[in-house]
Amino acid sequence: MSFRTLELFAGIAGISHGLRGISTPVAFVEINEDAQKFLKTKFSDASVFNDVTKFTKSDFPEDIDMITAGFPCTGFSIAGSRTGFEHKESGLFADVVRITEEYKPKIVFLENSHMLSHTYNLDVVVKKMDEIGYFCKWVTCRASIIGAHHQRHRWFCLAIRKDYEPEEIIVSVNATKFDWENNEPPCQVDNKSYENSTLVRLAGYSVVPDQIRYAFTGLFTGDFESSWKTTLTPGTIIGTEHKKMKGTYDKVINGYYENDVYYSFSRKEVHRAPLNISVKPRDIPEKHNGKTLVDREMIKKYWCTPCASYGTATAGCNVLTDRQSHALPTQVRFSYRGVCGRHLSGIWCAWLMGYDQEYLGYLVQYD
């Protein structure tokens, strides 16, 4: 079987790509015009809508098995404001709930910042999904556990409608793991262009497809080594009752919620070997706006995760500061591979996230 899927906040359909053979996308909701163009080209049989706040079932009155939503994380992520659900964009979770209540799909799959594992955020998301009839289980993990060269740290939640008995999934396509060990493109390009900046932004907004598959299949089967199996058998996860900590740092990193109680479970993680990237300061220009300049070599275990905002600053900072050493364009510029005056490559950013050029099509066809 394959789930007929509505993907909200779709971007370049990274969740659908990660769940290829498990999910069949029939409709997308995405506000970014560049992403809309890609979706209409890549998924010509699917419908594309542009505003999640106005979208209703009357716009697409067909049966849906699954809704997926990587709703904006600006209010939660370390790179964002960390204002939680008070942030306008992160508050769009209310539209996820509204649309879920309209369609009543068998499954809802959510993706967001690892900050969602804090119980004050779980109290909003998980308890609301429970209230509307969904049993939630979730996992928090970094992209380096599936081989990526960065550590995108995300929270994934599988919400199953309480009256639905999950069925065995026979994966309908031969999906294979992304190869981060070969065919790495150059990390910089000579010139700044609209096409390159667009791909940097789209990669930064996107998910890591293999990380999506790892989380979904692990939560569905109870086996976190099942990502590339051709048959996925529903399974259970057994945890222990979570003992709440005092203060705001209480977390349930991997867990589920049942009968008004949080449970946590453990799982084995093996991360890829560190890259140990050397980042060194260079000659300091007379004019710069940098504060807290770095005056020594820094060793970064992994590359920083691509971020959408880098699309407007692909050259990076002209001096190395402690803060800018955590921004990918500057990190690349001052690494052993970087050249001052060149620009962060969108094709390389997409490679870091785990998208092959065949999938991206025209998005990578620029100089």
From Swiss-Prot:
<keyword id="KW-0238">DNA-binding</keyword>
<dbReference type="InterPro" id="IPR018117">
    <property type="entry name" value="C5_DNA_meth_AS"/>
</dbReference>
<dbReference type="Pfam" id="PF00145">
    <property type="entry name" value="DNA_methylase"/>
</dbReference>
<dbReference type="GO" id="GO:0032259">
    <property type="term" value="P:methylation"/>
</dbReference>
<comment type="similarity">
    <text>Belongs to the class I-like SAM-binding methyltransferase superfamily. C5-methyltransferase family.</text>
</comment>
<keyword id="KW-0949">S-adenosyl-L-methionine</keyword>
<keyword id="KW-0489">Methyltransferase</keyword>
<keyword id="KW-0808">Transferase</keyword>
<feature type="active site">
    <location>
        <position position="73"/>
    </location>
</feature>
<dbReference type="InterPro" id="IPR001525">
    <property type="entry name" value="C5_MeTfrase"/>
</dbReference>
<feature type="domain" description="SAM-dependent MTase C5-type">
    <location>
        <begin position="3"/>
        <end position="367"/>
    </location>
</feature>
<dbReference type="GO" id="GO:0003677">
    <property type="term" value="F:DNA binding"/>
</dbReference>
<dbReference type="InterPro" id="IPR050750">
    <property type="entry name" value="C5-MTase"/>
</dbReference>
<protein>
    <recommendedName>
        <fullName>Type II methyltransferase M.CviJI</fullName>
        <ecNumber>2.1.1.37</ecNumber>
    </recommendedName>
</protein>
<dbReference type="InterPro" id="IPR029063">
    <property type="entry name" value="SAM-dependent_MTases_sf"/>
</dbReference>
<keyword id="KW-0680">Restriction system</keyword>
<dbReference type="GO" id="GO:0009307">
    <property type="term" value="P:DNA restriction-modification system"/>
</dbReference>
<dbReference type="GO" id="GO:0003886">
    <property type="term" value="F:DNA (cytosine-5-)-methyltransferase activity"/>
</dbReference>
